[in-house]
Every structure is written in C-alpha cells, then in structure tokens.
C-alpha cells in the first residue's frame, strides 16, 4: 500500500499569522460602523490597499505605483478574464502538475495546451524545451501544488525562451 498524495491544488498548512487575524478583526469591526463602513471597492481594488502593496514593494527597492496595481477576488476569475485579451489560436504552455485553473480556463476558451513535465529528475522545476513553441506560458513559483520554487537562473531560462519565441509569461508568485 502506498500513500496517495493529492496534487490537484496546493493547500495551506499553517494557521494565519497573528497580524492577519488582527487586520481581519479590525476590518470586520470597521464594517460594523457607519463612519468606517466601506462598500464594494472600485474595480481595481481599494486605494488604501493598493497603496499599501506599493509601499511593501518599495521596501524591497521595487517601484510600482499604486495605480499600476490591481487587486482582485482571486486567480480563478483573473485567469478567465486575462485570457480574453489573447487570441484563441495561441498555444499555451503549462508545467505539469499545475494549478488546474490555468488549464481549465484555456481549454474552455478553445486554446491548445502543451505541457512541460515537472518531475523528480528536474527537481519538479520544468524548464523550456526549445523544440516546443508556445505563445503564452503560465509559471507558478512556488508551484501549486508541489511547492517547488524556481531559482533566478531557471527563471532567466524561461524569460530567454519567451523572448526568443515572442511569448508572454503569466507569472503567479503563489504563497508569498
């Protein structure tokens, strides 16, 4: 008998950080009072949240203006929506295993999917195959569901591949 490991979608394994719990409590309390109540945000997300994200990245020396940040309700709707800007004739490359929504949203749109195998031999970090042509590349690092993470050299290999093939990389930095 062997243990079966579910590799459909990654799952969190630790409780929420205390700072997150406190922020959620404060947010819930704010919703209970007319003076601090906030309804639905603008389409791109609350300004205060986008500014906080901008400030966070600035602390690492990365300049991203708040108006360049989009806060959404999650990857599922984003994957479907972002696909609408690409041609249905585009070939999509995903690593395997991968977050199922990347595959599902593109199959529903009628795009061809090609897979790059992530396995023990490559440390569960698939690298580009020069014999495969893709227009859109989904990279998730740390990978969902395996948790493997690309290093800078491996990411550069993907960027070089994308530049050579005039491809777009959709990068999901899950579990930051």
Residue ranges: model-predicted function:
Residues 7, 24, 53, 69, ...:
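Generic structural signal for small/hydrophobic residues in well-ordered secondary structure
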Residues 3, 112, 168:
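Residue-level detector of anion-binding/catalytic polar loops
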Residues 1-73, 81:
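N-terminal small-domain helix-loop-helix segment of the aminotransferase-like
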Residues 84-141:
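PLP-dependent aminotransferase-like
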Residues 118-176:
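Active-site phosphate-binding strand-loop segment of PLP-dependent enzymes
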Residues 11-13, 98, 143, 175:
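Active-site-proximal loop/turn and secondary-structure-junction residues that shape catalytic pockets
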